[in-house]
Swiss-Prot record:
PANTHER family: ENOLASE. This is Enolase. The gene is eno. The keyword Metal-binding applies. NCBIfam families: eno (TIGR01060). Gene3D superfamilies: Enolase-like C-terminal domain, Enolase-like, N-terminal domain. The keyword Transmembrane helix does not apply. GO terms for biological process: glycolytic process. Binds a second Mg(2+) ion via substrate during catalysis. Its EC number is 4.2.1.11. (2R)-2-phosphoglycerate binds at residues 164, 340, 369-370, 391. GO terms for cellular component: cell surface; extracellular region; phosphopyruvate hydratase complex. InterPro entries: Enolase, Enolase-like_C_sf, Enolase-like_N, Enolase_C, Enolase_CS, Enolase_N. Its cofactor is Mg(2+).
Length: 430
């Protein structure tokens, strides 16, 4: 009798992401199911991330992924066909071994991750389980508070804002569905407020669906957001709070050894003072990458100073890498991890990274990348981990809303059980 969980075929192809760049899509088949996954890609990338394999040359301006696709079809597929699709960790470890490098540069993290996620989906489908339940078990019931990136700066935008993301979090809502409604209403009010102040051309959207108006000072977006939240009928701070992603590796000047914000130079202490001022003046509950990816000392300082009051998130600092997360925990650098599956390259390692963070009392924010697809795996992953937080862009563009819509479905499925943590987003169980 045939084994319903045996992998019978693996197919990879090149598709387009939300920026029109190629990315890898993988399908994994068993006699009773199919799992399909598409791989995201980032614009502001940490130096220590697992390597995304690109072809180079003229085709797609060098961004083709035919090599990664071929690595799936010719190298990975023959090795995993015949294996049990529920052996997630064995399959992930086998691919890591096949690759043989620390940063997955041989086969490509985009090849390996595509297979890893498609395997999980095929297994969930074979068992007739939703993906969040397959990964997280029966205890997966915490809905994430969205961190919605509504104003863009940095490498995601064409304006002069140095901080990359100005986000809103509906911390006062009673459910995910209510929270996402608040975000949507605020987003549309924000569009009107920006158009009135900066003109109609200022409401074009960036990679993640946020607006990129011609702002320069870091306080400008925060003032505009306060106005939009109030005009939408909500209370800044109490109902809708702010989260920032400074992405400061992007504005750190190595030659000067200084951070350049709004044309002004700041050393570590001065930048910390700027954050302190912003946190005292505005309802900011989370700051991501406040210092550059090797400024461990800066992270330790801000965590000591502000970590009791707000969340300090490591993204480029940790790159979802358990070694770097452990170093941060030992030093007391940051108090939360930004979890991006494509930074590490397999589902098993991403889950390990999350649990390393949880065990140390760190928060975990499950995150998209700026180059996304209609794949909504991270919505299921956020619930599977009971992370309590998700970062997946503005409520605009189908690639972002695919995740929000999946979370609406999951909350409906978990009716009567689902918990929306609100202000307890960092430690949903406290």
């Amino acid at each position: 009798m045939e084994n319903p969980f045996e992998i019978t075929a693996v197919v990879a192809r090149e598709i387009l992401d939300s920026r029109g760049n190629p990315t890898v899509e993988v399908e994994v088949y068993t006699p009773v199911s199919m799992g399909r996954a598409a791989v995201p890609s980032g614009a502001s990338t940490g130096t220590h991330e697992a390597l995304e394999l690109r072809d180079g040359g003229k085709r797609f301006h060098g961004k083709g992924v035919r090599r990664a696709v071929e690595n799936v079809n010719k190298i990975i597929a023959p090795e995993i066909i015949g294996m049990d699709v529920t052996w997630q960790r064995d399959i992930d470890m086998l691919m890591i071994e096949l690759d043989g490098t620390e940063n997955k540069s041989n086969l490509g993290a985009n090849a390996i991750l595509g297979v890893s996620l498609a395997v999980a989906k095929a297994a969930a489908n074979a068992l007739g389980l939703p993906l969040y339940q397959y990964i997280g078990g029966t205890n997966a019931y915490v809905m994430p508070v969205p961190m919605s990136n509504v104003i863009n700066g940095g490498v995601h935008a064409g304006n002069e804002l140095d901080f990359q993301e100005f986000m809103i979090m509906p911390v006062g809502a009673k459910s995910f569905r209510e929270g996402i409604r608040w975000v949507s209403e605020t987003y549309h009010t924000l569009k009107k407020v920006i158009a009135e102040k900066y003109g109609k051309n200022a409401v074009n959207v960036g990679d993640e669906g946020g607006f990129a108006p011609p702002m320069k000072e870091v306080t400008e977006p925060l003032e505009v957001l306060i106005k939009a939240i109030e005009e939408a009928g909500y209370k800044p701070g109490d109902e809708i709070a702010f989260a920032l992603d400074a992405a400061s590796s992007e504005f750190y000047d190595e030659k000067l050894g200084k951070y350049v914000v709004g044309g002004k130079e700041y050393d570590r202490g001065e930048l910390l003072e700027l954050y302190r001022e912003l946190v005292s003046k505005y309802p900011i509950v989370s700051i991501e990458d406040p210092f550059h990816e090797e400024d461990w000392e800066g992270f330790v300082m801000i965590t000591r100073e502000l970590g009791g009051k707000i969340q300090i998130v490591g993204d480029d600092l940790f790159v979802t890498n358990p070694k770097r997360i452990r170093k941060g925990i030992e030093m007391g650098a940051a108090n939360a991890l930004l979890l991006k599956v494509n930074q590490i390259g397999t589902l098993s390692e991403a889950i390990d990274a999350a649990y390393t963070a949880f065990r140390a009392g760190y928060g975990v924010v499950v995150s998209h990348r700026s180059g996304e697809t209609e794949d909504a795996t991270i919505a299921d992953l956020a619930v599977a981990l009971n992370a309590g937080q998700i970062k997946t862009g503005a409520p605009a563009r189908s690639d972002r809303n695919a995740k929000y819509n999946q979370l609406i479905r999951i909350e409906e499925e978990l009716e009567g059980i689902a918990v929306y943590p609100g202000k307890r987003f960092r430690n949903p169980f406290l």
